[in-house]
Amino acid sequence: NLIENLYKDSREDSEIKEKFNNEIKSEIPILTEYKEVTHRPIEVFSKDYQTYCFKDFGIYIWRNEDEYFSIRCGLLGQNGVGGHSHYDQLAIECFTNRNWIARDPGTGTYTDNTELRNKFRSLGYHWGPRADIKFPNEDEFDCFRLNYMSDGEVLTYYKNGFLGYADFYGKRIYRKIEIENGIVTIEDYSK
């Protein structure tokens, strides 16, 4: 294989080879075969912005000194259990014109009220895909576990866009973000 022939000597070459092989193996689906939900465009950036990737934490950021946009897509944490995590894969946060347009509600409340805790960590309390998915009720033994959401997977991330997916109760949802002339468009795709 061409990549193996190009990068076969040093440890650094081996790491580069692995990176290229991973990129080649990433499959980007033909999204026109999926149901599409297009969200209202958001005017975010009035000037240039930088990108920041925190892959291990699963956060991808576009920002300048006044404006901010991010998406959560990554590992659940605690060896896949989720622990204190929420159902926030593919959820966004957005700050522009001195206002939060979309904001993660945070931990909400640590309480012995399981129903309230589950509400604060649900899809409905985050700015993620609005999927019509009915999760089973989780009891006090499930409060510190994410049973119905997978790790998020980023397929592409660059200055003007993002494409990633996560599975929610067995349903795969892709989220595509494009930024053009400071305007963010978000599209969700599922079968």
Task: Describe the function of each predicted region.
Residues 95, 165-167, 187-190:
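Residue-level recognition of well-ordered beta-strand positions that form the cores
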Residues 68-154:
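Catalytic core of carbohydrate-active enzymes
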Residues 52-66, 135-181:
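Extended, loop-rich substrate-binding clefts of extracytoplasmic carbohydrate-active enzymes
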Residues 1-101, 157-161:
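Carbohydrate-active enzyme catalytic cores, enriched for enzymes
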Residues 113-116, 187-191:
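Acidic (Asp/Glu-rich), glycine- and aromatic
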Residues 92, 162, 175, 186-187:
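Hydrophobic residues positioned within well-ordered beta-strands of beta-sheet architectures
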Residues 101, 181-189:
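C-terminal catalytic subdomain
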